């Protein structure tokens, strides 16, 4: 079994853990509707993705 040769310092441990934090979600403004949506995701209200109709749009009640 592998064993560390040297003790990891608190600084090195903290630098390694700095990438573990959660990042906030990224949103882009839709060109057609102006609403915010996730990049590279289908707009569920219109059913459009990259200018193509992928899903049938939901009817608003």
Swiss-Prot record:
One of its GO terms (molecular function) is structural constituent of ribosome. It comes from the Bacteria. GO terms for cellular component: large ribosomal subunit. Keywords: Ribonucleoprotein, Ribosomal protein. The keyword Ribosomal protein applies. InterPro entries: Ribosomal_bL32, Ribosomal_bL32_bact, Ribosomal_zn-bd. Residues 1-35 are annotated as: Disordered. GO terms for biological process: translation. Residues 1-16 have a biased composition (Basic residues). Pfam families: Ribosomal_L32p (PF01783). Belongs to the bacterial ribosomal protein bL32 family. NCBIfam families: rpmF_bact (TIGR01031). PANTHER family: 50S RIBOSOMAL PROTEIN L32, LARGE RIBOSOMAL SUBUNIT PROTEIN BL32. This is Large ribosomal subunit protein bL32. It comes from Agrobacterium fabrum (strain C58 / ATCC 33970). The lineage of its organism: Bacteria, Pseudomonadati, Pseudomonadota, Alphaproteobacteria, Hyphomicrobiales.
């Amino acid at each position: 079994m592998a064993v560390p040769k040297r003790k990891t310092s608190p600084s090195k441990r903290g630098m390694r853990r700095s990438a573990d934090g959660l990042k906030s979600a990224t949103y882009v403004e839709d060109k057609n509707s102006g609403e915010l949506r996730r990049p590279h995701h289908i707009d569920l209200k219109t059913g459009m993705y990259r200018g193509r109709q992928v899903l049938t749009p939901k009817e608003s009640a």
